[in-house]
Amino acid sequence: MPGPVTWLPDAEGTVTDLPVFGSASPMREVTETVAFDAAWDSSRRAKVRELFDGMAADWSSRATPEREASILDALDRGGLAGGTVIELGSGTGLGTGHLIERFDDLIALDLSMQMLRHQPDLAPKVQADASMLPFPDGAADLLVLVNMLLFPAEVDRVVRPGGGLLWINTLGHETPIHLSPEAVVDALPGSWTATAGRAGSGLWAAVQRV
């Protein structure tokens, strides 16, 4: 059953006039169909892996203070506890560098081996498909997804009772891989509630199992 989303006031310096970018990306349709229709198969997996393998070498050059602001704000105001934290879609480590400063028990996971090869050795790395996580039921206190596809059934399986999900889109509604906080809560099985906010050029949702 979907729970409520409580929006916090925008952080100081939030960018509200975002250029049209991600809403026209083919990844937007992939994001929505994967979250709501479970439309993920070996062909789509291979195409997404190839896409991100090809972008890995210069992926870190996309980092800007405005994009990172949403990650920092989510960690500051999201209110989710740590414990065992797994970052899904860790890429080359844009979020990982901030997460390792907050959480002692962190695993960085990505579908793209090339992304992981370009990521600094900040945390243990796992190359895997987030639709079939190599972790037992209830293994995580917190999952962190920065510009990452949402696989609701696996989130529901891996997050412990009382655990949570931190969902971050660093370009807000213009992030190619974007779902609104309301859509994230709606997609998840079971009962969840969320706190959401905007900072820099991005938005985030701290989603708690209830």
Predicted regions and their residues:
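A short acidic, Gly/Pro-enriched loop at the edge of an enzyme's catalytic core
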Residues: 131-143
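Core SAM-dependent methyltransferase catalytic element
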Residues: 196-210
